[in-house]
Curated annotation (Swiss-Prot):
GO terms for molecular function: ATP binding; heptose 7-phosphate kinase activity; heptose-1-phosphate adenylyltransferase activity; phosphotransferase activity, alcohol group as acceptor. Its EC number is 2.7.1.167, 2.7.7.70. The gene is hldE. Residues 336-462 are annotated as: Cytidylyltransferase. This is Bifunctional protein HldE.
């Protein structure tokens, strides 16, 4: 069954003039663009609608337009696309943003708009429509471009009256989003809301928890451009970016909001929804203009970025020292774990996936063959060290693998200086090697019944 999603917010027209630019005007020192193509598309909250339609959702839109030709165009366009359309009219210009683009580069943007709040009577009409139709929808998306539709009165009333989750793409006054299910500011917006600049991981944590608590939010997602996203629920979780090429970030925030709403309405949890949204954004920033991504494009994109097994991710001590220094310099959170990983199994994979979720980069130390033999006996390892390292390096969760000769990874940990040191749940109450170096030690429970020793014993009994 298709999810049914209601969008409220500022609709506008995105107007594109595509052309060629290879000369300077004789009238003034400015570029001349020879227009070759012109497009009008749904923008603002309308672009959120476009993205939802591309995913396959059933969509409704509540907004305000002017009593002008652009308002008529928007209404007709929504209706042509099969959108349940509730557009109220006021004596104000319909927002239109014109972008002139040459050689895939935006030269200039011209805005025609009115930013003042909509009239009190119009606000009441919006709420009347909302009360009448909300029972038909699974989720509400508020797309705020600060053009006057989502006033504090409208926003707060919608949040309080909604019987379904309300997700918000915020702008400026965050207080009006109090009590929302989720808001998704970018780093700049979040910094402005908390009153301090987010410069590193600690700033990000402080800002995220502050916003979540003070605004009484169920969840919060801070989008971090090329650094991915940070999810704040019961714990903070990082989702790395997946964009390969960035041509135009126009509308990427709309895509993320739409993708989050669509995935949650389809029954996904927030982490799964964020991964889906990240992939969708990776598709659209590779296009020009306020683009959309279909489910087929997202699936194809996901396949294209899957990590291929390669020895390039297997490093020696010297290489990992340089890499670690660079990662620390860039403020990345390094997670480190280690083990023999003799026969890679489900328990290992799930353990490593959970470890990766704790930071930005996962480095895995692997015992050498000689080290395994000393620890496990003369009949081990089953698989030689390079094979074990290669298999680990092929996992999506693992960023780097280092083989160490010692019985413990202490010397390697001294080089890496991880932010988080991860060991299995069986280390509860035991001293963890390297705990004096890492900033934090985390224990992750293994999958019950999954162990290399058990597999080896079953093999021997055959």
């Amino acid at each position: 069954m298709k999810p049914r999603i209601l969008v409220l917010g500022d609709v506008m027209i995105d107007h594109y003039l595509f052309g060629k630019c290879d000369r300077i005007s004789p009238e003034a020192p400015v570029q001349v663009v020879d227009v070759q193509k012109e497009e009008l598309v749904l923008g603002g909250a309308g672009n959120v609608v476009n993205n939802l339609l591309a995913f396959g959702a059933e969509v409704g839109i509540i907004s305000v337009v002017g009593e002008d030709a652009n308002g008529i165009w928007l209404e007709q366009r929504f209706q042509e696309k099969g959108v349940q359309t509730y557009l109220l009219k006021e004596n104000r210009p319909t927002t239109k943003k014109s972008r002139i683009i040459a050689s895939n580069q935006q030269i200039v943007r011209v805005d025609r708009e009115e930013k003042k709040e909509i009239e009190s009577l119009t606000q009441q009409k919006i709420l009347n429509v909302f009360d009448r139709v909300i029972k038909e929808y699974d989720l509400v998306l508020l797309s705020d471009y600060d053009k006057g539709v989502l006033t504090k009165e409208v926003t707060q009333t919608v949040i309080q009256r909604s019987s379904v989750p309300v997700f918000v793409d915020p702008k400026n006054d965050f207080e009006k989003y109090r009590g929302a299910t989720l808001i998704k500011p970018n780093k700049k917006e979040a910094s402005k809301a908390v009153g301090f600049l987010i410069k590193n991981e600690e700033d990000l944590k402080r800002a995220g928890w502050k916003l979540k608590k003070e605004l009484d939010l169920q969840s919060l997602i801070v989008t971090l451009s090329e650094e991915g996203m940070a999810i704040f629920e019961e714990e903070m979780m990082r989702i790395p970016t997946v964009a390969k090429e960035v041509y135009d970030v126009t509308g990427a925030g709309d895509t993320v909001l739409a993708a989050l709403g669509y995935a949650v309405a389809k029954g996904k949890n927030l982490k799964e929804a964020a991964v889906f949204a990240n992939l969708a954004a990776g598709v659209v920033v590779g296009k020009v203009g306020a683009a959309t991504a279909t489910l087929e494009e997202i699936e194809e994109y996901e396949r294209s970025i899957r990590k291929a097994p390669t020895e390039e991710f297997i490093k020696d001590f010297e290489e990992i020292e340089l890499i670690s220094k660079d990662l620390h310099k860039r403020g990345k959170r390094i997670v480190f774990t280690n083990g023999c990983f003799d026969i890679l199994h489900l328990g290992h994979v799930k353990y490593l996936q959970k470890a990766k979720e704790l930071g930005d980069v996962l480095i895995v130390g692997v015992n050498s063959d000689a080290s395994v033999k000393r620890l496990k006996g003369d009949d081990r390892p089953i698989n030689p060290q390079f094979d074990r390292a290669y298999l680990l390096a092929s996992l999506e969760a693992v960023d780097y693998v280092v083989i160490f000769e010692e019985d413990t990874p202490y010397e390697l940990i001294k080089i890496v200086k991880p932010d988080i040191l991860v060991k299995g749940g069986d280390y509860k109450g035991k001293e963890v090697v390297g705990s004096d170096i890492a900033k934090e030690v985390r224990l992750i429970d293994f999958v019950e019944g999954k162990s290399t020793t058990a597999i080896v014993e079953r093999m021997r009994s055959c």
